[in-house]
Amino acid sequence: SKTLKHFNIDPKEAVLKRYSELNQMQWKLLEQGKISRDQVKLRRFQILFNELETNASAEEAALMYETLLAYGHYFMDGAEELLKTLYSKYRLFLVTNGTLSVQKGRLKSAGISRYFENIFISEELGYNKPSIEYFDCCFSKIPDFHKKTSVIIGDSLTSDIQGGINAGIRTIWFNPSHDKAVDIIPDYEFDSLRKLPELLSKI
């Protein structure tokens, strides 16, 4: 909303909802290999501004938004406690389709990098989830990696769960809104962060 206000656009609920829809659409296209990451950053604002019939610069908005994102983060209730618990029992790796500058900035400001043995950012690797190339690249950088003892945990069916399926590892879907999985089926799912340690201990 700060970015929209800067360009004198009222960040009312309908506008923010439409931006969210457009943003998700662009990331889906990236996952499908139809557009580039730079196009994701730009197109979400280009389409929104076109629909709002404003002359605001999509290029300037995209740059400003990325800068703000890099310094913004929030924890879900129990998130850092969960990381501490898992860190004491498992090897943790972070896999993300986010942009390099945003993800590194967020991780630094959140102070959670220490919990991960390695962090795999798609822009850095040159491949995106859910492609098998992305996961093959990640696996090649993990010492003593074994698919049978590995799982991917994520909230996106199309990038995290489909990616795990493509890569041949078990999948755990974080589904707090109790959505129904239809075409992409995870091996396990949970709806609350506090339930994850027990689930992991049973599989």
Language model feature labels by segment:
Residues S1-D77:
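N-terminal helical cap/lid subdomain that shapes the substrate entry/recognition surface
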Residues T96:
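Conserved phosphate-coupling serine/threonine residues in phosphotransfer and NTP-handling enzymes
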Residues K84, L100-I203:
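Asp-based, Mg2+/Mn2+-dependent phosphohydrolase catalytic module
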Residues F93:
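Conserved serine/cysteine hydrolase catalytic core
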Residues K89-Y90, G168:
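Glycine-centered short loops/turns at secondary-structure junctions
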Residues G78-K89:
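Catalytic-core regions built around general acid/base machinery
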Residues I9, T54, S88, D144-F145:
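Short, well-ordered coil loops that connect the C-terminus of an alpha-helix to the N-terminus
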